[in-house]
Design a protein with these regions (language model features):
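Aromatic-lined carbohydrate-recognition surfaces of secreted/lumenal glycan-active proteins
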Residues: 56, 109, 129-146
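Active-site-proximal, glycine-rich beta->alpha crossover segments in alpha/beta enzymes
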Residues: 5-98
Length: 194
């Protein structure tokens, strides 16, 4: 939804480009009321269709900073650091308040395109603690949660098309079902994991 909004919402990206200061595009994006309402409605309806706790995956604050800046200044070369990531986390934390009533159980921040210092997440940790959400970070082969301290292996999405298990699958795993997976085959492969 975030990528689609950045590529298709011309009115919003125009507003995001009004100032070139680092973080302005992200701040404008995260504070847009229409986007906030649409994101909240999508998450709320997704949670309501499940009978188990739902954890929402998002880009890391640093990745959000890169994505929003790239959306309005695609030809510039950027180099953001951990301080920029922490500033971005402030805007993200404010945006996350939108999901207060959605009944999500936690958040996973995708760091596959670049790790973020744990301290940079402090604004988000404060919000998560208030709402009693768990926080994890996704890396290439694992999802790491700090409180409680848990590491969950990532089952590659190719499993859902090949059936080949490349990791130990006892206990919890994290996975994404491949777009080209056949639904009946997915059900069979899911049974193999049990």
């Amino acid at each position: 939804m975030i990528a689609q909004e950045l590529s298709e919402n011309q009115k919003l990206t125009t507003a995001m480009s009004e100032k070139s200061r680092a973080g302005y595009a992200l701040r404008t994006f995260m504070s847009d009321e229409e986007f906030r309402a649409a994101a909240s409605a999508l998450v709320a309806s997704s949670v309501q269709t499940q009978r188990i706790p739902v954890v929402m995956q998002l880009p890391s604050p640093l990745q959000m900073l890169y994505s929003t800046t790239r959306a309005v200044q695609p030809d510039l070369d950027y180099d953001f650091d951990d301080d920029d990531a922490e500033n971005a986390a402030i805007y993200c934390a404010d945006w996350l308040r939108t999901f207060n009533g959605t009944q999500i159980a936690g958040l996973i921040f995708d760091e596959r395109e670049g790790e973020v210092a744990e301290e940079a997440y402090q604004p988000i940790k404060n919000i998560a603690e208030h709402y009693q959400w768990v926080i994890g970070v996704r890396r290439d082969n694992e999802v790491l949660f700090s409180s409680p301290k848990i590491t969950i292996p990532v089952l590659p999405s190719m499993y859902w098309t090949s059936g080949e298990v490349t990791i130990k699958t006892s206990g919890a795993i994290f996975t994404e079902i491949a777009r080209d997976a056949v639904p009946e085959q997915v059900l069979d492969f899911r049974e193999k994991l049990s």
